[in-house]
Each structure stands twice: as structure tokens, then as C-alpha cells.
Amino acid sequence: MRKYEIMYIINPTVLEEGREELVNQVNALLTSNGATIAKTEKWGERKLAYPIDKKKSGFYVLTTFEIDGTKLAEVESKLNIMESVMRYIVVKQD
């Protein structure tokens, strides 16, 4: 299993309770695919470098985890259909 980081941006129109639920859903998605979550950091709402879907800000979340690389594609495909996740990136740690 390798270490990865995922940074995702939640739509700013999602309320606080909805954000917490979405963070829990993403963490549950990771663990259901065999990931071990090391930590989740909520960076809060920040200005975007460029507008995404006519939004100028987003709520940033960074999660560090370990997962088998073959399971990562399934996680990414499910993240693609989550409407409240505006963007995400998964990076392998050294």
C-alpha cells in the first residue's frame, strides 16, 4: 500500500452540516476501498485562482491516506459523480 494525499474543493453553497457529511462520505468511500486514513485537515473557505462553475471560492479539504493503487481508480470514479465536489487531485507521497 502506498501513501497518497487527496485535496478536494467543496462547493461554497453547501452548508456547514452538509460539508461535514460530505467529508465523512469521502472518508467512508476511501475506507470502503481498503484505505487507512492518517489525517483529514479542513483548510476552510478560500478564494479560487479562477472561477469554477461561476464560483469564486471553495471549501478546501486535505486527506492523507494509504491505499492499494489498484483501488484508486474506483475512488476517483465515484468522486467524479459527487456534485458538491468541484475539483479534486490525488497525489502520491514519497
From Swiss-Prot:
The yes or no answer to whether the keyword Ribosomal protein is present is yes
Keyword annotations from UniProtKB, A to Z: Ribonucleoprotein, Ribosomal protein, RNA-binding, rRNA-binding
Q: Which GO terms describe its cellular component?
A: cytoplasm; ribonucleoprotein complex; ribosome
Supply one GO BP term: translation
Q: Which InterPro entries match?
A: Ribosomal_bS6, Ribosomal_bS6_sf, Ribosomal_S6_plastid/chlpt, Transl_elong_EF1B/ribsomal_bS6
Annotated GO MF terms: small ribosomal subunit rRNA binding; structural constituent of ribosome
**Does this entry carry the keyword Protein biosynthesis?**
no
Q: Which Pfam families did the record assign?
A: Ribosomal_S6
Superkingdom of origin organism: Bacteria
Question: What is the annotated role of this protein in its UniProt record?
Answer: Binds together with bS18 to 16S ribosomal RNA.
Q: Which NCBIfam families match?
A: S6
Similarity annotation: Belongs to the bacterial ribosomal protein bS6 family.
The record's PANTHER family line, in alphabetical order, gives: MITOCHONDRIAL 28S RIBOSOMAL PROTEIN S6, SMALL RIBOSOMAL SUBUNIT PROTEIN BS6M
* Protein name in the entry: Small ribosomal subunit protein bS6
Q: What is the lineage of its organism?
A: Bacteria, Fusobacteriati, Fusobacteriota, Fusobacteriia, Fusobacteriales
